[in-house]
């Protein structure tokens, strides 16, 4: 067995579960349950980070982008769980030190673990979003501990997203989030590209709360994660600076929820459909974003499914 698999199977506290026939079903009811599940998934990664903590090499399976982006992706994606954990009052000193060191090393052009100079349509821009959201919501973990030089390096590395072309689709939110993050910590950002990205996102709106993912007309579980989810995050991050759009995105989320609820069964199970097959954990992200943004489009007892 691969060592990572061994650690996953035997490490960390177990969330509660129950059996439904031959199927093991997790019974997640409390914050502690979800915290235990997060640790179950992420704790096995701790010994796998690179020496400088900026990279994770988790296997040899292939993707369409290069090894640099693969290892950055593995570094950044755990932040989608760790940042809410920190914002909710959680603490894990080991992960906090890993990400402090990793951000410093990965953004340092003189460091062998530097994430590099980006180009057109670069996968690195996708991974910037998690870092940006971390800076926006948990700066005391991901920004404040950095030295002045490390902050300048990280801002410069993130700022590359403003110097290159990105796809005309949900990727616009990555540039939006990066610019919001840079602005929030007093670093150079592009108000012009921030507004341009928001205008593009607005152009995707198709009515009744729905948006398309750019020019694509398909509708699947990816859309709520790629558009509505980030829209709700924006509505909270920019509530004071862009109240008109913040209110608009919340209104659209209210409309969207009335239809999207029927994409889940009474137990919360979702259909194995579309691009969503590789993003199963993101299928319910819209509902989590609603709660975090203080929005209750449906009774909480129903959302809790």
Residue ranges and their predicted role:
Residues 71-72, 82-84, 96-256, 261-291:
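Aromatic-lined, polymer-binding surfaces characteristic
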Residues 18-20:
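A detector of repeated loop/turn-to-beta-strand junctions in beta-rich toroidal repeat architectures
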Residues 291-303:
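Extended polysaccharide-engagement surfaces of secreted carbohydrate-active enzymes
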Residues 9, 303-305:
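Conserved small/polar residues in nucleotide/adenosyl-binding loops
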Residues 25-73, 97-102:
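Low-complexity, Ser/Thr/Pro/Gly-enriched N-terminal "stalk/linker" regions
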Residues 3, 7-14:
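Glycine-centered tight turns/hairpins at beta-strand boundaries that repeat
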């Amino acid at each position: 067995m691969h060592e990572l698999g061994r650690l996953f199977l035997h490490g960390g506290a177990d969330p509660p579960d129950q059996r439904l026939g031959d199927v093991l079903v997790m019974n997640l009811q409390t914050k502690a349950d979800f915290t235990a599940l997060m640790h179950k998934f992420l704790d096995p990664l701790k010994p796998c980070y690179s020496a400088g903590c900026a990279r994770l090499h988790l296997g040899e399976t292939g993707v369409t982008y290069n090894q640099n982006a693969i290892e950055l992706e593995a570094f950044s994606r755990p932040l989608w769980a760790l940042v809410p954990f920190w914002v909710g009052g959680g603490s894990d000193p080991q992960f906090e030190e890993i990400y402090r060191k990793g951000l410093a090393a990965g953004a340092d052009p003189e460091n062998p673990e530097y994430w590099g100079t980006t180009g057109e349509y670069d996968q690195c821009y996708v991974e910037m979003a998690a870092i940006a959201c971390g800076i926006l919501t948990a700066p005391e973990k991901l920004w404040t501990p950095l030295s002045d030089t490390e902050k300048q390096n990280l801002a410069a590395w993130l700022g590359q997203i403003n110097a290159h072309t990105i796809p005309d689709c949900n990727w616009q939110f990555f540039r939006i989030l990066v610019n919001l993050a840079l602005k929030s910590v007093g670093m150079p950002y592009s108000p012009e590209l921030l507004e341009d990205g928001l205008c593009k996102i607005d152009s995707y709106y198709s009515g009744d709360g729905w948006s398309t993912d750019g020019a694509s007309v398909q509708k699947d579980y990816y859309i709520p994660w790629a558009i509505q989810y980030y829209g709700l995050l924006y509505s909270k991050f920019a509530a004071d600076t862009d109240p008109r759009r913040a209110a608009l995105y919340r209104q659209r989320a209210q409309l969207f929820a009335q239809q999207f609820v029927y994409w889940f069964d009474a137990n919360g199970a979702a259909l194995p459909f579309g691009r969503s097959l590789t993003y199963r954990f993101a299928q319910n992200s819209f509902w989590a974003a609603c709660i975090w943004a203080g929005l209750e489009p449906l009774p909480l007892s129903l959302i809790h499914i």
